Amino acid sequence: MSQSASTPATPITAKIVAEHGLTEAEYAKVLAIMGREPNLVELGIFSVMWSEHCSYKSSKKWLKTLPTTAPWVIQGPGENAGVIDIGDGLTAIFKMESHNHPSYIEPYQGAATGVGGILRDVFTMGARPVANLNALRFGDPSDPRTRHLISGVVAGIGGYGNCVGVPTVGGEVNFHASFNGNNLVNAMTVGVARADRIFYSAAAGIGNSVVYVGSKTGRDGIHGATMASAEFSEDSEEKRPTVQVGDPFTEKLLIEACLELMNTDAIVAIQDMGAAGLTSSCFEMASKGGMGVDLALDRVPMREEGMTPYELMLSESQERMLMVLKPGKEDMARALFEKWELDFAIIGTLTDSGRMVLTWHGEVVGDLPIDPLAAASPEYDRPWEPTPMAAAADLSGAEDTPWSEALLRLIGCPDVASRRWIWEQYDHLVMGNTLQRPGGDAAVIRLDEAPGKGLAMTTDCTPRYVHADPVEGGKQAVAEAWRNLTAVGARPLAITDNMNFGNPEKPRIMGQFVGACQGISEACLALDFPVVSGNVSLYNETNGQAILPTPTIGGVGVLDNVEASVSIALKAAGEAILVAGGFHGSTGAWLGQSLFLREILGREEGAPPPVDLAAERKVGDFVRGLILGASVTACHDLSDGGLLVALAEMAMAGDLGAELTLEGHPDNGRLFGEDQGRYLLTVAEGDRDAVVAAAEAAGVPLRVVGTTGGDALVVNGFVGPSVAALRKVHEEWLPTYMAG
């Protein structure tokens, strides 16, 4: 070991340790592991590898409780992305990941590099990306920063995804004051690969070359992982240098070059450089394979002059990959990457030492054991307290607003208003396989690799539900994803989760995380809908104010006959409208935590609607059978805003009115209640009796509630808003707001 590593040039003071995000106890553990004081390079490596962002030290105890297996799961959590068997020798490979903290500081680049990073996670596994989705949460529209953040984030997502040539096909957007200081940007990519051509990240083969490919390394993103592991304060704007800068054109070249190399037998292991850059990719690959690595940092392609080993190890420059190649394949691989005008450098060798030895022009500048920084990194069992049960919602005044007025207000409120202004900035049709565009329950794409087969995908979470009851909210997020896939006729197969929460050092916040994990686990088990990948983003707080807990669920399902899928749009006049699924209570009206309660009565209170998972599955399986049997002409799950908002969305999508005929007085609870596990269906009048009989035989609640036709919504003879009036209100809020 050289003098530079054993006697640090920079004395490691308590201040420097704190600046690196390590606690006193963690630094004491570093000293015990190293048997000496680390130098600055080594301290920086411990800092990022033990950060919450990389180590999951507060969350992994609970993530281990999630169900991750099923006969169709090929690879669950622990790799770059999850892999599921979709039949015909094909797999779907997918993951969702957050880029929350960078997107608040520098919205365009933060969101753009979030897309770039999740694309790399998927094509690293050997898949060609076929679809992107995003789940976005912004602050109150009245907050002065919200408009700026929406503009930058949407432009960043579109700018990157459009240039790479992968369609952005769906997602969701919510607004709430709790996100004023921490917006959420959760990006999801789905790819398709042959089942016999999947690539993994475990390094193997003593003496094999460790190869760097892609863009050169600059100073952008240094300590990005550490920044994403701390609360924000008033000076967070000063963290702009820690936001990475993306180049989608280079990413496109990198995708094509990697996929071309994957058609040879050259690759032993491959890993993208994401959070913590070269450090994380090296340590993870070596740890998974039980290897050591000798790394010559002076061989790393550099974008800027005078870069130091510390900067090279911690940079989060984008569009970079690390590979282990088979002996003798280096020259062929170099020629391939040079053809694509990408950097290629052999920067290291695999060893059997179990250590990471870093050199700079032949001098050792770092020597660390691998496992304590990766597989054996810290794991905390943080104190947590359950969320108190919410008091019953005050429903006084619920009948004071006529349903027609309430509907117009809800259909134009920020959480329901059309997202057209957003998704029209995304190329959702590139590749030519998008069957259902944004705006429905789930996106549907055809697969070139298997004519007739399709994939459906969705993102879902209702943060206000999770805040009121994390267990029920976690269940509901999974159930709604399952329901949205079912509503287009897909067979739900698996999920990826993106767990966005506040400071886990606070027992109340940690309790939200634990509760959500419990709810997600219950729902996944009941619905045969395992977790195959995911991401955790904690410390989403500013000045001590936490976000609403947001465990976003990305769901993927398969359609063996993609032409059998249905959309939400009403198709023809004279068809029967039916509701599948029952109400929770005898009144048939769950208004606790509903949009109606918040937007019309101005109250956020009560418990969220409970989820009956057995009923959810029974009703969903029945509805899917109807769709695949060609009995259903349109289908929409009932969620935000309940029955009447769902019907209005179907009417606008099909440019056709509808009339509801309900038993008794149609009170606002029945019209806008958010009872779970329900679908709104239309069937041809000639099929109505057969469908009702089939439901009765299956023991599934199903009620005929109306008929399609006309140019307005009518309830029990009372003529409400026209479809044109609904569309005007629905479409105008977001463009008007963004015009400022």
UniProtKB/Swiss-Prot annotation:
Q: Where does Mg(2+) 2 bind?
A: D121, D272
InterPro entries from the UniProt entry: PRibForGlyAmidine_synth_PurL, PurL_linker, PurM-like_C_dom, PurM-like_C_sf, PurM-like_N, PurM-like_N_sf
Keywords assigned: ATP-binding, Cytoplasm, Ligase, Magnesium, Metal-binding, Nucleotide-binding, Purine biosynthesis
Instruction: Please list the residues that bind substrate.
Output: S98, H99, N100, H101, R120, Q244, E316, S317, Q318, S537
Q: What is its EC number?
A: 6.3.5.3
* Family annotation (SUPFAM superfamilies): PurM C-terminal domain-like, PurM N-terminal domain-like
From the UniProt record, list the reaction(s) this protein catalyses. N(2)-formyl-N(1)-(5-phospho-beta-D-ribosyl)glycinamide + L-glutamine + ATP + H2O = 2-formamido-N(1)-(5-O-phospho-beta-D-ribosyl)acetamidine + L-glutamate + ADP + phosphate + H(+)
Pathway info: Purine metabolism; IMP biosynthesis via de novo pathway; 5-amino-1-(5-phospho-D-ribosyl)imidazole from N(2)-formyl-N(1)-(5-phospho-D-ribosyl)glycinamide: step 1/2
Catalytic residues? H53, H99
What is this enzyme's class at the first EC digit? ligase
Q: Where does ATP bind?
A: Y56, K95, D497, G534
**What is one term from the GO cellular component aspect held by the record?**
cytoplasm
Residues bound to Mg(2+) 1 are: E97, N535
CDD domains noted in UniProt: PurL_repeat1, PurL_repeat2
According to its UniProt entry, the protein's GO biological process terms are: 'de novo' IMP biosynthetic process
Q: Enumerate the GO terms in the molecular function aspect.
A: ATP binding; magnesium ion binding; phosphoribosylformylglycinamidine synthase activity
* SS bonds (residue pairs): none
Q: Name one Pfam family in it.
A: FGAR-AT_linker
* Summary of subunit composition and partner proteins: Monomer. Part of the FGAM synthase complex composed of 1 PurL, 1 PurQ and 2 PurS subunits.
Q: Which HAMAP family match?
A: PurL_2
Family from the record: Belongs to the FGAMS family.
Tell me what this protein is called.
Answer: Phosphoribosylformylglycinamidine synthase subunit PurL
Source organism per UniProt: Rhodospirillum rubrum (strain ATCC 11170 / ATH 1.1.1 / DSM 467 / LMG 4362 / NCIMB 8255 / S1)
Which taxonomic lineage is given here?
A: Bacteria, Pseudomonadati, Pseudomonadota, Alphaproteobacteria, Rhodospirillales
What's the gene? Answer: purL
